[in-house]
């Protein structure tokens, strides 16, 4: 069953358009230098996520919700794969990521940046070795559709690592989807959605304290995370 959008939003399409507009505005004002500084600052969150699927040599890796490349370029620094495909709905974010991919330290690697809907991936079935996604699932109105797409495109034995915030109290329907608030679910709900999509949780890492530290120190502009006392987890998923 698909997730129900919040009552204050008219439709999943409306949620997507508002979210896309918000991130296009945010990323168009962020240069490559700022994006690289953010990648360094968030390494305490990205590195544990990557460690769930390491090593990545000779793998086809997909980063869902690449944005400006905070996770993707950290992958290239730690364990370069055969091919890295970054997918996002934000043209502005992808523009920054494409620029960074041309830097001398990254241009030797094989990278594709694709603008697409994460609920309808432009990828062939059973073509991907590893899927990564960081702080993206909560932006999607239909999380089950996105998880089913992940299950469709991964090869047998593939690994999937997803991290995001999870609510610890009642649904926050009056809050913003764009800030990863209204779209948050509980860990239990996430587990059920994964099972419905043919995926199961093989491991997890609690990164709540790391995110709290980043937000408190002004390294991650996400005050709502603290205001709503959310958890942040990284999950390793495999196909059932």
Predicted region positions:
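A short SAM/SAH-binding and catalytic strip from SAM-dependent methyltransferases
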Residues: 130-141
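N-terminal, positively charged/glycine-rich alpha-helical extensions of SAM-dependent methyltransferases
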Residues: 1-31
């Amino acid at each position: 069953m698909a997730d129900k959008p919040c009552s204050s939003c008219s439709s999943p399409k409306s949620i997507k358009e508002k979210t896309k507009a918000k991130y296009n505005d945010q990323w168009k004002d962020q240069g490559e230098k700022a994006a690289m500084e953010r990648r360094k600052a968030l390494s305490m969150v990205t590195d544990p996520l990557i460690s769930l699927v390491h090593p990545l040599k000779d793998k086809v890796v997909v980063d869902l919700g690449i944005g400006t490349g905070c996770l993707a370029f950290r992958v290239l620094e730690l364990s370069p794969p055969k091919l890295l495909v970054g997918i996002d709905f934000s043209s502005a974010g992808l523009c920054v990521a494409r620029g960074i991919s041309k830097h001398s330290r990254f241009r030797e690697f094989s990278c594709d940046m694709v603008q697409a809907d994460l609920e309808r991936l432009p990828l062939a079935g059973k073509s991907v070795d590893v899927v990564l996604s960081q702080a993206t699932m909560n932006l999607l109105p239909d999380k089950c559709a996105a998880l089913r797409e992940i299950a469709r495109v991964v090869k047998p034995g593939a690994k999937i690592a997803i991290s995001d915030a999870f609510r610890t109290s009642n649904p926050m329907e009056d809050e913003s989807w764009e800030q990863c608030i209204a779209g948050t679910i509980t860990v239990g709900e996430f587990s059920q959605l994964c099972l419905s999509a043919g995926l199961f949780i093989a491991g997890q890492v609690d990164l709540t304290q790391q995110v709290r530290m980043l937000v408190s120190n002004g390294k991650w502009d996400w005050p709502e995370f603290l205001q709503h006392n959310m958890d942040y987890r990284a999950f390793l998923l495999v196909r059932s």
